[in-house]
Regions:
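A short beta-strand-loop-beta hairpin characteristic of the jelly-roll/cupin
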Residues: 56-80
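A generic "binding-loop/recognition-motif" signal
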Residues: 19, 43, 52-53, 71, ...
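Conserved hydrophobic/aromatic beta-strand scaffold that supports enzyme active sites
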Residues: 34-38, 56, 75, 83-85, ...
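A short, N-terminal "cap"/entry segment at the start of jelly-roll beta-barrel domains
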Residues: 1-33, 46, 115, 119-143
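Ligand-binding loop in jelly-roll beta-barrel domains
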Residues: 79-80, 88-117
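Histidine-centered metal-chelating micro-motifs
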Residues: 44-46, 65, 84, 88-94
Length: 143
């Protein structure tokens, strides 16, 4: 059993909209997963929600705009040192509207247990790729 996980020895997932650096796979935990999100200037994942997941973000570098709600009507400025909580089933997105990369740690918690239909991070990424018509093999990379 692992107790310590490195943020520098990660598996990288380069989506068309952002990068995720996997630190702790959900398969190695009871109800959590951890990854670093990197947004280059102009990048933003699409507005989305997770019905079965609460997310906590810790902003490490850069400033970004957090948008909340189905119409992304609520706007918040986030900066290094800020902690963001996204309750389950909440529409959200973080957009890098600046000139330098944004990095934040995401800790995902699954109330009760991790999703049975996506027991690993790779399973989750495959589902995202299928929904977006992205190629999984081109997204998963070593760091």
């Amino acid at each position: 059993m692992n107790y310590v996980f490195s943020t520098t020895d990660t598996v990288v997932y380069r989506f068309p909209t952002h990068v995720n650096e996997l630190v702790l796979d959900r398969s190695e935990s009871t109800v959590t997963e951890v990854f670093i999100v990197v947004l280059e200037p102009g990048e933003a994942p699409p507005l989305h929600k997770h019905p079965d997941t609460e997310q906590v973000f810790y902003v490490l570098e850069g400033e970004a705009e957090l948008r909340i709600g189905p119409e992304a009507a609520e706007h918040f400025r986030v900066k290094p040192g800020d902690v963001v909580r996204i309750p389950p089933d909440t529409w959200h997105k973080i957009a890098n509207d600046g000139r330098v990369p944004v990095r934040y740690m995401s800790v995902d918690a699954f109330p009760g247990a991790r999703p049975a239909d996506e027991p690993t991070w790779d399973d989750h990424v495959r589902a995202i790729c299928a929904a977006q018509s992205w190629d999984f093999a081109s997204i998963k990379r070593s760091k």
